[in-house]
Amino acid sequence: MADHRPPGRLMGVKNYLIDGVSGTGKTAVAEELQRRGYHVIHGDRELSYRGDPETGEPLDGLAEETVMDWPAWVHQHHIWDVDKVKSLVADQRHASSFFSGGARNFTRFIDLFDGVFILDVDLDTLNRRLAQKPEDEFGGRPAERALIARLHATKEDIPSCGVVIDANAPLAVVVDGILSKCGEAD
């Protein structure tokens, strides 16, 4: 993969982003990478907040009842802390770091990554996985599932520069495929 990072900037050895709509397996892939000893940042847990995707300004205190389409609003304002991403990418302590998750402000940091992988599944698999999510997790409610199905169909809000990975395959095969594309295969 080509190195699209800005020249002259101290970076971690190799940094990769694993993205895809909710239900495609980002968390499962990240956990398997961790199990295999790789450094993983769960971006949706460690870096995310509700904010303006253009400015990064936090949007706190907005009540659900004040927004017409709450799931779409939450999705559009799910962003990562760009300064934290930059700091983690610059960390030289790990040979490879895998960032897992999705953010609406990915255009502000995607060029920092050595590679971007987009997990994709067929609609039946997506619907089956979403049906297993608890209601307190994004994708666990019918309105959220409808939004995710639309995003799956349109591919909007997904980086277009990524390598698409068929995540219908067994987890070990998916992870082996990603590692092989990173030159990390055993």
What are these regions (language model features)?
Residues 18:
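Hydrophobic anchor at the beta1->P-loop junction of P-loop NTPases
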Residues 112-132:
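Conserved phosphate-donor/acceptor-positioning beta-strand/loop module used by diverse small-molecule
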Residues 31-83:
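Conserved substrate/cofactor phosphate-moiety recognition/catalytic segment
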Residues 21:
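P-loop (Walker A) phosphate-binding loop of NTP-binding proteins
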Residues 106, 132-186:
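Small-molecule kinase domains that catalyze NTP-dependent phosphoryl transfer to phosphate-bearing small molecules
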Residues 27:
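Walker A/P-loop
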Residues 24:
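ATP-binding Walker
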